[in-house]
Amino acid sequence: MSSRYLLSPAAQAHLEEIWDCTYDRWGVDQAEQYLRELQHAIDRAAANPRIGRACDEIRPGYRKLSAGSHTLFYRVTGEGTIDVVRVLHQRMDVDRNL
């Protein structure tokens, strides 16, 4: 069974914004490296959906996994499948942005 994930439109937009911001501050190499780090975290969560910490106090059924300066918020939606809901910077207000 292969691990799979879906990115919500908001999560996809966050990844694009993260790339743009990183590129503006540190250049293309760092932007590409950081996105690879985030992608690796998504792949890890997809391969082992329970790796992230449950955060039912935020949203029932959600899990979170830190990656660099960001946190992935996702739900386990089926056998071997996760839905990445948001990718938020650690400084962002989680309640407001979920």
Curated annotation (Swiss-Prot):
Top-level taxon: Bacteria
UniProt key word NADP: no
GO biological process: symbiont-mediated perturbation of host process
Cystine connections: none
Gene3D superfamilies for the chain: RelE-like
Keyword set includes ATP-binding: no
InterPro entries attached to this UniProt entry: ParE1/4, RelE/ParE_toxin, RelE/ParE_toxin_dom_sf, TA_system_RelE-like_toxin
Keyword tags: Toxin-antitoxin system
Entry's family note: Belongs to the RelE toxin family.
Function: Toxic component of a type II toxin-antitoxin (TA) system. Upon expression in E.coli inhibits cell growth and colony formation. Its toxic effect is neutralized by coexpression with cognate antitoxin ParD1.
Protein name per Swiss-Prot or TrEMBL: Toxin ParE1
Organism this protein belongs to: Mycobacterium tuberculosis (strain ATCC 25618 / H37Rv)
Gene encoding the protein: parE1
